[in-house]
UniProtKB/Swiss-Prot annotation:
Residues 318-338, 615-638 are annotated as: Disordered. InterPro entries: CID_dom, ENTH_VHS, PCF11-like, Pcf11_C, Pcf11_CID, Pcf11_Clp1-ID. GO terms for cellular component: chromatin; cleavage body; cytoplasm; Mei2 nuclear dot complex; mRNA cleavage factor complex; mRNA cleavage stimulating factor complex; nucleus. Residues 1-138 form the CID domain. It holds the Pfam family CID. One of its GO terms (molecular function) is mRNA binding. Disulfide bonds: none annotated. SUPFAM superfamilies: ENTH/VHS domain (SSF48464). GO terms for biological process: co-transcriptional mRNA 3'-end processing, cleavage and polyadenylation pathway; termination of RNA polymerase II transcription. This is Uncharacterized protein C4G9.04c.
Length: 638
């Protein structure tokens, strides 16, 4: 018994009444753990056998929900022992609950709701077997209740019984109701007589159900033995075939060819003569109790052969079991996904040369029909091979607790080969191609900047005023990994930007009053200097906006870092207007007190000495130009 079966059994203990949320949750768990369908089916069947009679109906409702909503492979595994599971519950529940079980059985003979498949939930062979047993059971009860029905034949209540259907004598005692059943044959291979049935019309749904069943078998085999390359190859081919059947509409002749190839693929090597000889005598002994049941003797017509002979005829004509993981009874040896199988079962899983040749022939026929690309079967070279290997290795991985606990050494080697370079700080992995190495270098530089920032921030505390403003944070872009400039380069760029701001100038106003006005922001007066290139008197580090002169650096500090929002510009202008208006008021107040202007205050911002020197230089240059022009004129006259 594996961990999945134990966990699901513990979850089934809460299903003590007909609760739709609990049934829905358990159905969802079964859907998530579909690779372990055998364990979940084992748990449900054990729960139905051991739970009290009042809890059997909710458990059968859970079985019904899983079968109708999930379908294969659960319907296949449930169908193997559905007869014993259903009848063991039917014989012990109250009479009022048997009507609900009859209604439940009627729904199993119809196709599942919201399903495109026309096939019923369970095989008609299984449901007919249960119906015949129910009719016999009800007729037996009626004979005991009414003496008039004592001599009534059961054949008057039921249709003719199949030769290989077991009688219901084993269910008279509830304690012994779940005994190990006889080896059952998959639904597609069951016979009524020794002759094989004629193949019916092949549909896409039936072919998909066969492929799904074989996928589950090969997946369980591959999980049990990860180093079985042939099982892995079969699993990959079946997955490709399922994708082709699901995505394309194939003609009937191709469906028939695929069906024949699947039938050849399912046929294992015939068992040895000794194994058949040792197992054959056990069949009549196992059926002796069934054939000797008192009330079953008059029910079987004389034209139908006895059960042991019919069974031996069907065994001699039928092919061996194709499903290596046939669900056993509770008293037999358990084969779970976590415990090792017996030696005989392990030998049965080993592929023979006949199976290997059938795999190759199936793959060759699929390639010839154009259903599988030619590169899918061979071993490709280069990156495509690693991608194909990764897809094949991760096909059966499920993000569940039990699946993640399964060791997969091939996946580890695949990770180390494809992502060989690892970051020493955080463990992040990169490939070995040039682009991946560049990404690793950028990632290492990012670690260096972050570590340096952490070391610097640990030396001093963090002040709230250092945080960026809300608008600046909204307009900023996080490009930390893309920054490659050093701190020195950033400082040089900032110095160049400030030099370009300080190099702005405004011509010195001719009006002495306007020239003496200070900056509206810092209230410092401007210094008039001579500009050599423009050859005029200017105010350096100054800009003029709306008739007012500002320091360019002051205006740069007052404005936001990005001149994109008009509201911030308006607030700056309002601040400047307020400063200018206050200065004007002060000036008008002083003028009212003293009507005569103060000459010293007017000439305070003007460098008179520099002006006189510049005028002298200009006069000398003009005189030299006049003298040179006069000499040129005299020479021309001569």
């Amino acid at each position: 018994m594996d961990l999945v079966e134990l966990d699901y059994l513990s979850a089934l203990e809460d299903l003590t009444f007909n609760s739709k949320p609990i049934i829905h949750t358990l159905t969802y768990i079964a859907q998530e753990n579909e690779p372990y369908a055998i364990s979940i089916v084992n748990a449900i069947e054990k729960h139905i056998q051991k739970c009290p009679p009042n809890c059997k109906l909710p458990a059968l409702y859970l079985l019904d929900s899983i079968s109708k909503n999930l379908g294969a492979p659960y319907t296949y595994f449930f169908g193997l022992h559905l007869f014993s599971t259903f009848m063991s519950a039917y014989t012990v529940v109250e009479p009022r609950l048997r009507l609900k079980l009859d209604q439940l059985l009627a729904t199993w003979k119809q196709r599942p709701p919201n399903s495109s498949s026309l096939e019923p939930v369970f095989s008609p062979i299984v449901t007919a077997k249960i119906e015949n047993a129910l009719l016999k059971y009800k007729s037996t009860i009626l004979r005991h209740q009414s003496p008039l029905l004592a001599n009534t034949s059961i054949s008057s209540f039921s249709a003719p019984i199949d030769a290989n259907i077991n009688s219901y004598s084993s269910f008279s005692d509830p304690a012994s109701s779940y005994k190990p059943s006889l080896p059952s044959v998959p639904f597609g291979f069951q016979h009524i007589s020794g002759t094989s049935p004629s193949p019916g019309f092949i549909t896409l749904d039936s072919l998909l159900s066969d492929v799904n069943r074989m996928i589950v078998t090969e997946q369980a085999r591959f999980i049990k033995n990860p180093y079985d390359n042939m099982a892995k190859k079969r699993f990959e081919i079946l997955l490709q075939l399922k994708n082709v059947l699901s995505s394309s509409a194939l003609p009937y002749d191709q469906l028939l060819a695929i069906k024949n190839q699947l039938a050849q693929l399912e046929k294992p090597a015939s068992p040895s003569t000794s194994s058949v000889a040792t197992s054959a005598p056990s069949v009549p002994s196992a059926l002796s109790s069934i054939s000797s049941t008192p009330f079953m003797k008059p029910s079987i017509p004389s034209t139908i052969p006895t059960i042991p002979s019919a069974y031996s005829a069907s065994v001699s004509s039928q092919p061996p079991l194709t499903h290596s993981y046939v669900h056993p009874g509770p008293q037999s040896h358990k084969y779970s996904l976590s415990s090792g199988p017996p030696a005989s079962l392990y030998n049965a899983n080993a592929l023979t040369p006949e199976e290997s040749s059938s795999i190759d022939s199936l793959f060759a026929n699929l390639q010839a029909a154009g259903l599988v690309p030619p590169s899918a079967g061979g071993k490709s070279q280069g990156p495509q091979a690693s991608c194909t290997e990764a897809v094949s290795l991760t096909a059966d991985i499920d993000l569940s607790k039990s699946s993640l606990a399964t060791p997969r050494p091939k996946l580890s080697s695949l990770l180390y080969e494809n992502y060989s370079n690892q970051c020493a700080n955080c463990g992040r992995r990169y490939g070995n191609d040039p682009e991946s190495r560049k990404e690793l270098d950028k990632h290492s530089d990012w670690h260096f900047r972050i570590n340096k920032r952490i070391r610097e921030s640990s030396l001093h505390g963090i002040n709230r005023c250092w945080f960026v403003m809300e608008e600046e944070w909204v307009n900023s872009k996080e490009e930390e990994d893309l920054i490659t400039e050093t701190a020195q380069e950033i400082e040089e760029q900032r110095q160049k930007q400030m030099e370009s701001v300080r190099s702005q100038y405004v011509l010195t106003p001719l009006d002495p009053i306007a020239a003496s006005e200070p900056c509206p922001i810092c209230q410092e007066k401007f210094q008039s200097v001579w500009h050599e290139e423009a050859e005029v008197w200017v105010f350096m580090n100054a800009v003029e906006e709306e008739g007012r002169i500002f320091h360019a650096t002051c205006l740069q500090e007052v404005r936001p870092s990005e001149n994109k929002h008009s509201n911030t510009n308006t607030s700056t202008q309002n601040l400047a207007e307020a400063a200018v208006s206050s200065n004007i008021k002060n000036a008008t107040g002083d003028a009212s007190k003293d009507s005569q202007p103060d000459v010293q205050n007017l000439l305070q911002g003007i460098d008179i000495q520099s002006i006189l020197q510049a005028l002298g230089k200009r006069k000398e240059r003009d005189d030299s130009m006049d003298s040179m022009s006069s000499k040129v004129i005299k020479q021309e006259s001569k």
